[in-house]
Regions:
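Short, glycine/polar-rich helix-capping loops at beta-to-alpha or helix-loop-helix junctions
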Residues: 139-151
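Generic N-terminal amphipathic, Lys/Arg-enriched alpha-helix
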Residues: 1-18
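Short beta-strand/turn micro-motifs composed of small residues
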Residues: 71, 109, 139-142
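Glycine/threonine-rich flexible loop motifs
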Residues: 113-123
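Surface-exposed amphipathic alpha-helices with a cationic face
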Residues: 60, 127-134
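Glycine-rich, small/polar surface segments that engage phosphate groups of diverse ligands
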Residues: 32-104
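A short, well-structured juxtamembrane/interface segment
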Residues: 18-36
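Short glycine-rich anion-binding loops that position phosphate/pyrophosphate groups of nucleotides
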Residues: 46-48, 110-113
Length: 151
């Protein structure tokens, strides 16, 4: 079997394992956010921050949802990290953005956040805040899903 054939075979197997109900639920959530005039805040670190930037572009341009990613503003991100710490960088950004119950937070993360293991504690704290103000939470996470999968 060639490399290409093997890759396509594996990709096909992965596609059959996707949770289509979860995907439909995510789509319905995004439709509601747009209909309610809510905003979409993308959170991610490392390579996932790059995915967030791309998603902001697509959701604003193609879907027509007001969307933002705090990692797109490097000067604010680094100032907050320096002055307030990495653990709270996203929660403080969401607070100043007045995250509310019409909005949604969308996480891209392999680990999904875990305070005990010190995996993306900034995501966990941001999601705790999102939950406290009634914002919807969704995301694309790795197998374990971390804290993101529990909210």
């Amino acid at each position: 079997m060639t490399y290409s054939e093997q890759h396509l075979k594996e990709a096909s197997e992965i596609l059959t394992k996707l949770d289509t109900d979860a995907i439909e639920g995510m789509a319905a959530l995004l439709v509601r956010v747009r209909a309610d005039g809510g905003r979409l805040f993308f959170l991610g670190v490392g390579g996932s921050a790059g995915n967030c930037s791309h998603a902001v572009n697509d959701f604003r341009k193609i879907v027509g949802i007001e969307a933002y990613a705090p990692t797109d503003n490097v000067s604010e991100l680094t100032a907050r990290t320096n002055d307030e710490g990495w653990d709270t960088v996203f929660i403080e950004w969401l607070k100043i953005s007045r995250l509310n119950d019409k909005d949604a937070v969308f996480v891209f993360s392999v680990g999904g956040g875990n305070l005990e293991k010190n995996v993306s504690p900034n995501l966990v704290r941001a999601l705790q805040h999102a939950k406290s103000v009634g914002a919807a939470i969704t995301g694309v996470v790795g197998r374990d899903g971390g804290f993101t999968a529990t909210v």
